[in-house]
Amino acid sequence: KAVPTIVGTVNFQVDIQQVTTSSQLGQASIIGPSLIDLKSGGYRLYLQARAGKNDKNNAEGVNILSLISSDGIEWNIEPGIRIKHGTQFDVDSEAGEPGVYLGMDEKYYMAYTGRFMGVNKRGLKQTMHRIVFAVSDDGLTWSKLNKHYSDPENINDFASSADVHLINRQYVIYYTGQRNIIRATSHDGLQWTRKKIAVSIGHDSTMVKYEDTYYMFVIMPKTLLYPRNATTENDILFLLVSDNGIDWSENYYQVIIKDSDGNEVKAQDIQDPGAIVLSDGSLRVFLNNHGGKIIYSIKPTEKLPK
């Protein structure tokens, strides 16, 4: 079997330096951008927000907020909370890392990360991660479906950072397991069948179909290896290629991001990618910086590999 190999680089530049900031939203931090094309035209951007002390929504804890845009460039903050976290006894006592998609029934769906304090196999308290589902007619007002997905093949049944797509009338979810990306499929978007590890190393992925090719952006270590007890803060962005959105080439491309001054963006500031193709056919990837103070977007400066 082929092993993952870095075969080259692909160049991106910062498009919008500040899509929004944590202080504009009155939050302590904002991370995990997820974007969707609206049926009515334009785009919505969803974010995980950790409430600040002077929160505009009088909220606390970790919730999901949104912004709206007609062009993908100028963004307006939408008041209120899209997904409010549950109680300390709920699977989503923190509600974060949104992944938004349009269902076959033309409703909007969200697969977000629910975190709660649970007890691990050793009997110790530990934060647990599950993928939780919600539905909306308009993308603004959401109802929780009281459904969640966990992966018993992972330690603590860990599953987070979901990214969901429709491929050939089937829902495909990519999510983060134990520092890898796992694929599951569903015919109704509610009952999921775990398929296999799609990417053997990495976390926080986003997939997009662009110019008839499927691309996945994944955060990975530069060496494509995690030594024991390794941290992820120096991980960088890689680009993976697929012709069907299911089978991924083991030839990986390192994404080089330069800011408007031509300086390379630091690894720590490249986190939680969320990709979208705008109506003019151009690609954008949204990211948050270290500490979740800023959301910014990037665009390719060269043709992507096929």
Regions found by a protein language model. Name each.
Residues 1-306:
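Carbohydrate-active catalytic/glycan-binding domains of CAZyme proteins
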